[in-house]
A protein has these predicted regions:
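Flexible catalytic loop/linker elements that gate and position reactive groups at enzyme active sites
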Residues: 488
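Formylglycine-dependent sulfatase
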Residues: 2, 7-13, 23-482, 491-527
């Protein structure tokens, strides 16, 4: 499905308006597509969006009307946990149903990492595909491209890409907006490829004659770094990693949300007469936060608040298109985030200065990277008007690791033996039809610490590391002593491990039980 890549290069808000006439045919045969037994499914996966970053989860310094409406139309889930406190391991677990700690090479991925999910593995996309769905991944990827680390030829068809793991269509960022290469990948090719500017990427050394943020700070005309992010400069912003070339294929950060939204709407239109699954992973609100001009000033919190408003707009675009095509009633939308929030993650965007009384993690302690609850508890909304009654709220304990098995069950997917080894079918809880807690969830911090959370308790095992993570200035939760917190009390303030040795023992047993299951798959990739 080839698309016009004009979306990178201009405001082109008009390009996002519906291009199919309002009276367009939305029936297949005599049956309305909205009355098919299989729902369309869209997972909207935000980046670094905290529990307290949305109005419907308590935010007062940013307006999120589209997300608020989505919550009113369905169920607000208040006890959902990402699989890890950082991006790559959370996304790996979500899409494979396997905890990332079982699989080598699932730390925060470089932009030239090889495919972390291998073709032999069963994925969420595979589940939908074998149930007869059209499948797509659009937006942030951060799970590697090509066969092996650092061996990609970005000027040719990548030998291994998302088409090999169940996605019929993909339009993705190779890693994140702050890492090279700063191009989109569509169907295994660099999108809008410019043959006059061949692409080279390195994470070990710069290319001769190419400026860097460290040596040429005068070229950082859009955003300067607060820490790190001082290697290659693209669009006046320093990045992690080095690259050369790109030309017309290079993105402009202010147009990333437009481009992602446009391709998402295009996929919906193209597949409106068949069931489809879309993994829509936004760049917002990850750094560098550089939203389009039309979102500037939407929040008193500066660029971070404006990026939240831009995320809300993306949600509104998707919902509006579904409504226009007559698909909204039978489309299941799940909205959540890959990990907790971070305020200063490497750019001088005044996010700390302008935060005011906003609490990105809501009532929870710390944020991204951390073992504390703010690292992994995330906002979540489920909306499916045909089946899920609106205006609900559930505090059932839920882990994103279970979404593959749950959604596979919903659509009648054939799940091969041994696939999604950590994913449990908890569809009833996800849809608000039951309030049953998961017995426990595992939460992986940036230093690989595996915490255990039940409804009442949070156990953090001893680990090494600084109390404060330098750069973002986040409390790590790392301690050489075991920590046990009663989650019925606020903010993980009192370590009660000595008072409750029986609970500590039980929580340790959960961790050992999971570790002893071992890895189900060993990647041939050299890391």
């Amino acid at each position: 499905m080839k698309r016009d890549h004009l979306f990178y290069y201009g405001t082109l808000a008009s390009a996002l308006l519906p291009v199919v006439p309002a009276c367009a045919k939305t029936k297949k045969g005599n049956a309305s597509v909205d009355n098919r037994p299989q729902p369309n499914v869209i997972v909207i996966y935000a980046d670094d969006l905290g529990y307290g970053d949305l109005e419907c989860f308590g935010a007062t310094r940013v307006q999120t009307p589209n997300v608020n409406a989505l919550a009113r139309s369905g169920i607000r889930l208040t006890n959902v946990h990402a699989i890890a406190a950082t991006s790559t391991p959370s996304r790996y677990g979500l899409l494979t149903g396997e905890y990332a700690f079982r699989h080598a090479g699932t730390d925060i991925a470089r932009g030239n990492a090889g495919m972390i999910i291998r073709p032999e593995q069963f994925t969420m996309a595979d589940a939908f595909k074998n149930a007869g769905y059209a499948t797509a991944a659009i937006g942030k990827w951060h799970l590697g491209m090509g066969d092996r680390d650092g061996e990609q030829d970005w000027n040719a068809q990548l030998p291994m890409h998302l088409g090999d793991i169940g996605f019929d269509y993909h339009y993705i960022m190779a890693a994140t907006a702050d890492r090279t290469p700063c191009v989109f990948i569509e169907q295994g090719h660099v999108a809008n490829y410019d043959a006059s500017a061949p692409i080279e990427v390195s994470y070990t050394q710069n290319f001769e004659g190419e400026p860097t943020g460290k040596e040429n700070p005068e070229l950082l005309f859009n955003l300067k770094a607060s820490h790190g992010h001082n290697q290659s400069i693209v669009n006046g912003i320093g990045r992690i990693g080095y690259m050369k070339g790109g030309g017309r294929a290079l993105w402009k950060d202010e147009n990333i949300a437009d481009s992602i939204a446009a391709h998402a709407l295009g996929f919906i239109r193209e597949h409106r007469e068949e069931p489809f699954f879309m993994y829509l992973a936004t760049n917002d609100v990850h750094v560098p936060r550089f939203p389009h001009d039309r979102f500037r000033g939407k929040s008193p919190m500066g660029l971070r608040g404006d990026a939240i408003a831009q995320f809300d707009w993306t949600v509104g675009q998707v919902v509006s298109e579904l409504e226009r095509l007559g698909l909204r009633q039978n489309t299941l939308i799940i909205l959540s985030s890959d990990n907790g929030p971070v305020v200063d993650d490497g750019y001088a965007d005044r996010a700390v200065e302008l935060l005011g009384d906003h609490r990105p993690a809501g009532p929870y302690r710390s944020g991204k990277y951390s073992t504390f609850e703010g690292g992994t508890i995330v906002p979540a909304i489920v909306s499916w008007p045909k089946r899920v009654k609106g205006g609900q709220e559930s505090d059932a304990l839920i882990s994103q690791i279970d979404w593959l098995a749950s959604l596979g069950s919903l659509v009648g997917a054939r799940m091969p033996k041994g696939s999604a080894p950590d994913s449990q079918n908890r569809l009833g809880t996800l849809l608000g039809e039951e309030k049953e807690d998961r017995p426990y969830v595992l939460e992986q911090a940036a230093n690989h610490t595996l915490s255990v959370r039940t409804r009442e308790w949070k156990y953090i095992p001893p680990s090494k590391g600084p109390a404060i993570i330098s750069g973002p200035g986040i409390e790590s939760g790392y301690s050489r002593e075991p920590q046990l917190y009663d989650m019925r009390r606020p903010y993980e303030q009192e370590n009660v491990s000595l008072q409750h040795p029986d609970v500590v023992f039980r929580m340790q047993a959960y961790t050992e039980q999971e570790r002893n299951k071992g890895a189900s798959y060993t990647s041939p990739i050299s890391k």
